[in-house]
């Protein structure tokens, strides 16, 4: 499931719910999304019934994150500065949320390190391709939309069925999520690197 490939189909949904957002500057929307991500990270760390509010925070952060680009295009305020701010805040949001999972009593700092670096490398490879003249690379199994969906699903699992068992590692919904992000993150980063490198190598030969 690669939800980033469905972005063009989301335009109708954004049109339907986006009118109230058109009066808000796009950069402000980006900052609001980031603030919800920070709050969600703290709530995830706290655990317990706070996870319900963490789920809502992730949902709101995702909504505002989708809206900033939509509003920028609709109001003619799209800019490189806004895009740069949006991507910077997205990475900080990723760190804040995954840090909440990592330092949670149900998480793992060690798995969290690899999950965070895997996610950051995934995003870096996507935008680095664009910086050298290619299209932004969304290839792979762990785009940002996918990550946010997985996060919300595993928060629900932790609320409903908070299992905990050991087999070399301590497995909880949170550690399984971090392990998946670590593995899928590096696989996605490698996939994006390989596809971009091949395309660049082909340009040099032509």
Language-model features: where?
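Basic, amphipathic juxtamembrane/active-site segments
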Residues: 69-110
